[in-house]
């Protein structure tokens, strides 16, 4: 994952597009207002904000509504915070249900082996998506998954090698600034996507 400074220092932009406003809810804030955290729920909260389905006076209520609508289950508890895990197949449909409860009409398409255009087409039509990535944890030797809101894309060319890199501009669920996810990274165990249309 690349941050903005790294991108502009080491790459030139070949093509890019992104939503007009970058939406994020950092993990410490979410934990402080909800006592809970799940990456998919945080990603969907950003998606909900994009479609004007989030009540900023009740972030905690909306977060827990998304938690419930996606069937997110408790994976662990630590330091008074409840952490959750969400099945990929529940993420898109659960978000559609959450939005319907807010009288916002959104459809979804989940792809378990998306190509790069799955995400670029979504952004180009003015919508938002969620990417789900799997990788083998160096700590446990087991698959670890993470879901992030996709708010743009950038095809980059490295200054030193001339290699082209396809990236997704994501809210990583942890911080407040855009990160560039390398879609071409060869150590992903799996990549899935949920694209919305609203």
Question: What residues fall within each predicted segment?
Answer:
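Feature targets compositionally biased, intrinsically disordered low-complexity regions
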Residues: 34, 60, 70, 78-79, ...
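Predominantly the structural core of cysteine protease catalytic domains
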Residues: 37, 45-46, 74-156
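Secondary-structure boundary/capping signal
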Residues: 55-56, 103-107, 158, 178
């Amino acid at each position: 994952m690349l941050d903005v400074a790294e991108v502009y220092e080491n790459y030139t932009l070949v093509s890019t597009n992104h939503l007009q406003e970058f939406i994020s809810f950092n993990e410490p804030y979410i934990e402080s207002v909800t006592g809970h955290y799940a990456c998919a729920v945080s990603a969907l909260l950003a998606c909900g904000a994009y479609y004007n389905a989030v009540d900023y006076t009740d972030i905690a209520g909306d977060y827990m509504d998304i938690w419930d609508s996606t069937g997110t289950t408790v994976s662990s508890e630590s330091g008074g915070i409840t952490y959750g895990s969400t099945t990929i197949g529940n993420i898109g449909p659960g978000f559609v249900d959450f939005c319907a409860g807010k009288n916002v009409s959104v459809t979804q398409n989940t792809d378990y082996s998306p190509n790069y255009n799955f995400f670029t087409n979504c952004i180009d039509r003015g919508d938002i998506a969620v990417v789900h990535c799997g990788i083998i944890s160096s700590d446990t030797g087991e698959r670890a998954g993470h879901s992030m809101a996709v708010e743009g894309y950038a095809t980059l060319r490295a200054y030193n090698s001339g290699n082209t890199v396809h990236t997704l501009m994501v809210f990583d669920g942890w911080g407040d600034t855009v990160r560039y996810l390398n879609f071409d990274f060869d150590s992903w165990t799996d990549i899935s996507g949920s694209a919305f249309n609203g």
